[in-house]
Amino acid sequence: MAESTVTADSKLTSSDTRRRIWAIVGASSGNLVEWFDFYVYSFCSLYFAHIFFPSGNTTTQLLQTAGVFAAGFLMRPIGGWLFGRIADKHGRKKSMLLSVCMMCFGSLVIACLPGYETIGTWAPALLLLARLFQGLSVGGEYGTSATYMSEVAVEGRKGFYASFQYVTLIGGQLLALLVVVVLQHTMEDAALREWGWRIPFALGAVLAVVALWLRRQLDETSQQETRALKEAGSLKGLWRNRRAFIMVLGFTAAGSLCFYTFTTYMQKYLVNTAGMHANVASGIMTAALFVFMLIQPLIGALSDKIGRRTSMLCFGSLAAIFTVPILSALQNVSSPYAAFGLVMCALLIVSFYTSISGILKAEMFPAQVRALGVGLSYAVANAIFGGSAEYVALSLKSIGMETAFFWYVTLMAVVAFLVSLMLHRKGKGMRL
């Protein structure tokens, strides 16, 4: 059977346009489910920490769950390599189908897993194993979906179309948070802590089945001739593009750290540091993430006009200047509206990175190692800096040095700014 492919072209028929829209929807649906499943863990950890870990104070149990969260990130480089190779050697579509199946399995395991009182140390061990499995899946999802959405996008509007990767990434995070908020308002706290937290994990597994069906309908964007190249999906081929690889490591380190600081960790920060009720903090983050999601296409479209380099310079400079003031102000904030405003200021800055994250990286690598280059470089930096964000923040808080974390984020923003200075100017040196 002949393989159906779709590639970027500025001259489109109405049929081509429909196919591209369907491709964006199909790829995005799987991306949303992947990140919904992954973020459910973070948002539900306040409720299940005591289930899987021995009795102790709240900070200690949260620290242990954050450690498992970070451990999931350690599998991302392996996932980035494995799924990147599959995508470059056998096709983007096959890689995306496999990653959704793996995430579904991990969520089902957590939804059904007995607690510490029932199976003892097997509980945290199996929880860790499930998270490692999910980390492997997400490590492969990012690079492949970013590559796919970048390749299917139309020339001159690539920033706009590719921004939908983070629309669905944030959408998955938002949906996870929204489900938690609904459960908080419809269930007793005791029931939520006892068994209600399992509902989002089960829901994620069901949604994965829908995403799997949608992705089966997708066209392939890579060409058979490219996949047949000897260096396709190989580390040797990636080594020839090591400058791009190192640069992606640099700005992803800061981008991931800022993203996880102001999204997943922020809910805990508002509760444990600002002293807000968990329900109030969840409401603030739900509203903030919704607005954050909506502005991605706007700033992605802006990058089509001003260039990716300018967008990244805006991110690096603004994050370096305003991270400490924003986090310091949030320490003592009492008004939910003020907290929302401060969080939105931070997320607006982060949007200059998130909206173009996928297309920026994809434009830096040739087709035969594009998924591998995007996925592996992102996964390595994300595992080290993004995955450890909560753990580092909570560790510093536990020893009374919480403000040191603010300066750590600021330092990485400076690194992103310096690396961005080395990016090609608009229209020069792009691979797509």
UniProtKB/Swiss-Prot annotation:
Membrane-crossing segments per the record: 33-53, 63-83, 96-116, 119-139, 163-183, 194-214, 244-264, 280-300, 310-330, 340-360, 374-394, 403-423
The protein's GO terms of the molecular function aspect are: solute:monoatomic cation symporter activity
Places the protein is found: Cell inner membrane
Provide Cytoplasmic-side residue ranges: 1-32, 84-95, 140-162, 215-243, 301-309, 361-373, 424-432
- The stretches that face the Periplasmic side, renumbered to this chain, are 54-62, 117-118, 184-193, 265-279, 331-339, 395-402
Membrane topology listed for this record: Multi-pass membrane protein
Checking InterPro entries in the record gives: H+-coupled_symporters, MFS, MFS_dom, MFS_trans_sf, MHS_symport, Sugar_transporter_CS
Where is it mostly found? Answer: membrane
Please give the superkingdom of this protein's source: Bacteria
What's this protein's family per the entry? Belongs to the major facilitator superfamily. Metabolite:H+ Symporter (MHS) family (TC 2.A.1.6) family.
The free-text function statement in the UniProt record for this protein reads: Uptake of alpha-ketoglutarate across the boundary membrane with the concomitant import of a cation (symport system).
Q: What is this protein called?
A: Alpha-ketoglutarate permease
Q: Gene behind this chain? A: kgtP
